[in-house]
From Swiss-Prot:
PANTHER family: UREASE
Gene Ontology BP annotations: urea catabolic process
Alphabetized Gene3D superfamilies for the sequence: Urease, gamma-like subunit (3.30.280.10)
Subcellular location: Cytoplasm
Catalytic activity: urea + 2 H2O + H(+) = hydrogencarbonate + 2 NH4(+)
Name of the coding gene: ureA
InterPro entries: Urease_gamma, Urease_gamma/gamma-beta_su, Urease_gamma_sf, Urease_subunit
Keyword Hydrolase: yes
Protein name: Urease subunit gamma
Length: 100
């Protein structure tokens, strides 16, 4: 199977998000890469589901709460930007302060 660099990046994010979901389900606090992957995957999947950029900007803030991540992680993520594939093309989605 041949994958483009973009497809490899998406697959890596999805794999890291699966690991983060499992750790979160076990009650573990997520670290920086796990938190970013989980929020990013939620945005990418929402785009594929047909949600608008505005909806995803709002939804991205509800993926994780401060008590679900390790100390200091929320402050390390002021913004998350993801190029997501929508039914009408690729768009940049920016979520400001994703972990409240």
């Amino acid at each position: 199977m041949e994958l483009t660099p973009r497809e490899k990046d998406k697959l890596l994010i999805f794999t890291a998000a699966l690991l983060a979901e499992r750790r979160k389900a076990r009650g573990l606090k997520l670290n920086y890469p796990e938190a970013v992957a989980l929020i990013s995957a939620a945005i990418m999947e929402g785009a594929r589901d047909g949600k608008s950029v505005a909806e995803l900007m709002s939804d991205g803030k509800r993926v994780l709460a401060r008590h679900e991540v390790m100390d200091g992680v929320a402050e390390m993520i002021p913004d998350i930007q993801i190029e997501a594939t929508f039914p009408d093309g690729t768009k940049l989605v920016t979520v400001h302060q994703p972990i409240a």
